[in-house]
Amino acid sequence: MSQEKYIMAIDQGTTSSRAIIFNKKGEKVSSSQKEFTQIFPQAGWVEHNANEIWNSVQSVIAGAFIESGVKPNQIEAIGITNQRETTVVWDKKTGLPIYNAIVWQSRQTAPLAEQLKSQGYVEKFHEKTGLIIDAYFSATKVRWILDHVEGAQERAEKGELLFGTIDTWLVWKLTDGAAHVTDYSNAARTMLYNIKELKWDDEILEILNIPKAILPEVRSNSEIYGKTAPFHFYGGEVPISGMAGDQQAALFGQLAFEPGMVKNTYGTGSFIIMNTGEEMQLSENNLLTTIGYGINGKVYYALEGSIFIAGSAIQWLRDGLRMVENSPESEKYARDSHNNDEVYVVPAFTGLGAPYWNQNARGSVFGLTRGTSKEDFIKATLQSIAYQVRDIIDTMQVDTQTTIQVLKVDGGAAMNNFLMQFQADILGIDIARAKNLETTALGAAFLAGLSVGYWKDLDELKLLNETGELFEPSMNESRKEQLYKGWKKAVKATQVFAEVDD
């Protein structure tokens, strides 16, 4: 009797690494998770030890095997999904990083980004990469490492160093240095990749003086990149055959295969991505243009809007204000509020993301009266998440001149039924919550399984992650628009308050 086969997804996130084993039905068989150290050398800087990340991945692979009893030779293929933009530069010979990984959140390269803007490169970079010039993306992080580690530039030019985002680093380690590759979705977040011509952009590399020799080869999101070295996978030689940045993996895991389909992951922040099909569309309203995924010889583009504070607003109610003991409790309090929704919380704790991009804005509250209760405040905080999502959905509809019919949702805060119902009401469209909320890891597993024939095609995948629950709008049009108008007023006032005094 032949043994059952499985797919393993490695989900390397910002605070922890996870390994999840999925079966043919797309169900989770086992998972293992390990946190690692956040390094803050200075205010606003965030770094990780890339070796510690690698150790944590080795540990969770073992944990997933131990928990399930599945053997390494029962894994048909491995899919990798990762925190995007985070940058590692390492020695080709020893495999040791020459500096800590600089994390996507880190602002240590902001002066470099400002310098590029002042030199007039904004439009050029936007047209080529689809991105706005920002310290968020990998380009300035690579430049910073080459500038600040003695002899690094010279060694990079000699071909002694390699660069990669976390996907590249993990494949290189798992294959024991046999494969130095990345995928379309991760390459598109480096600010070095021309997403129209699908190649590293020579002009941008020249502007930043980054040697081409250090860059990985860019491949599709679903193909065999290499096999695990047996001593790194507990004796198994298993193909690594699917890869995508976390938000793009969630798009794929949500089965958003058709142009116009949109998903939102309600995590710490909120990431809304729309599949725009094979045509690249540049946003005129401060959304990012990126690559969703590339499979079967075709590349599918996407528009992305990022909200900095979503689930973390609920954490703030819990840890900062001590208004709730745990996150799910926020739903009960919100339902107990009986005010007329006239309180607005604008959670701009780290500035406002898309479509405002105002880094000076700070959190504010409007509409308080003597009668305002804790319940009202908690409800207004949950509603602020939904209002921010509407800001982006409205912008996407303007950019693409389409009408979005349904929003597919996942992530921790998507479990909050009050928030999901209010989201449906304020958007006036259906909200489809995935049955399996592990959409990021599932997306990586789907990409890996497709390329080795574990799943036949996209049609087979469509049967595996149905909608768990549908939330339909129940608010009348005039009420909906009146509430949203109040939100826009609150955001405007927040921005006025943030203006720098002369």
Swiss-Prot record:
Key enzyme in the regulation of glycerol uptake and metabolism. Catalyzes the phosphorylation of glycerol to yield sn-glycerol 3-phosphate. Sn-glycerol 3-phosphate binds at T14, R84, E85, Y136, D246. Belongs to the FGGY kinase family. Keywords: ATP-binding, Glycerol metabolism, Kinase, Nucleotide-binding, Phosphoprotein, Transferase. GO terms for biological process: glycerol catabolic process; glycerol metabolic process; glycerol-3-phosphate metabolic process. One of its GO terms (molecular function) is glycerol kinase activity. The phosphoenolpyruvate-dependent sugar phosphotransferase system (PTS), including enzyme I, and histidine-containing protein (HPr) are required for the phosphorylation, which leads to the activation of the enzyme. The keyword ATP-binding applies. This is Glycerol kinase. PROSITE patterns: FGGY_KINASES_1 (PS00933), FGGY_KINASES_2 (PS00445). It comes from Streptococcus pneumoniae (strain 70585). Glycerol binds at R84, E85, Y136, D246, Q247. It comes from the Bacteria. InterPro entries: ATPase_NBD, Carb_kinase_FGGY, Carb_kinase_FGGY_CS, FGGY_C, FGGY_N, Glycerol_kin. Homotetramer and homodimer (in equilibrium). ATP binds at T14, T15, S16, T268, G311, Q315, G412. Pfam families: FGGY_C (PF02782), FGGY_N (PF00370). The lineage of its organism: Bacteria, Bacillati, Bacillota, Bacilli, Lactobacillales. Activated by phosphorylation and inhibited by fructose 1,6-bisphosphate (FBP). The modification Phosphohistidine is found at H232. ADP binds at T14, R18, T268, G311, G412, N416. The keyword Kinase applies. It catalyses: glycerol + ATP = sn-glycerol 3-phosphate + ADP + H(+). Disulfide bonds: none annotated.
